Amino acid sequence: VWHGWTPTDLIFPFFLFIVGVAMSFSFAARGNAPQLRKVLVRSLILFGLGVFMAAYPRFDLTHLRIPGVLQRIAVCYLAASLLVLYASRKTLYWTLALFLLGYFLLLGSDLTVEGNLAARVDRFLLGGHLWKATWDPEGLLSTFPAIATTILGYLAGERLRPNENVEKGENGHEKAATLFAAGWALILGGLFWSIWFPINKNLWTSSYVLFTAGAALQFLGFLYWVVDVKKWRGWTYPALVFGRNAIAVFALSGLVAKSLILYKVERRDGSLASLYQLLYENAFASWAGPLRGSLLFALATVLFWWIAMLVLYRRRIFIAL
């Protein structure tokens, strides 16, 4: 299905949204300290890591995919940071509106897989360096509305941070209610806009930006109310273990999976299979069947990496950029 969404389509925009939220707290904590150099270095490392993961293990530059998940995070973080640090609040709002409305007008009525303007721009500028032969979900034009997602996260973080509203008597329940209300407004706005501009993750349509940012606001409001207002924090420990080394676990899990797929082993019948395939077949599918085996394999992979990150967490090893 090209248009529409599934729960998995919330993961990436939620991450970009929380990048924006984190920017608000990070920039405020540093005060007037120089921040541009740190932003540039962090963005370059993220982008470079994304390209390295795309190239690994063959490092064939002929058809190396240039866009990617980490590359988009890097560009969105850099662009949003520059706007936040050097543009006025009014300019920030106008830029947000320009990215959403401009993208809507640019794409026009042709939103087909290969015929949309974003895909045509990617083919023209990036040629064979795309995820698919004719398009890329992390392409060039669709990065602009993705930046808007990050900006919305920053604005949410500004609302969430302790400020003068606390001194005026605003309590945590009211702040959580504000986040919920804003979330509903964005969700409804996204659904309404989707009548003309369908919700589409691969195109990162403007309706998708509003819808997912609204959902992220709802989730953020819920977590804020549960963790910071009600002080129910013990259940967050598993997520905290992953969260303190989020980029590390993303990169390492991807590189290990590629390595297991790369190396082939000869079966008894003489056919070749990757270590990844053999692990799945022998440890899970052989007794649980292909469907349940696939689920169990995925859960076991998550558990393996959680334990690995737990070791780092307990040793206070946090790989930060």
Q: Residue locations for each model-derived region?
A:
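Alpha-helical transmembrane segments and their immediate juxtamembrane cytosolic regions
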Residues: 1-321
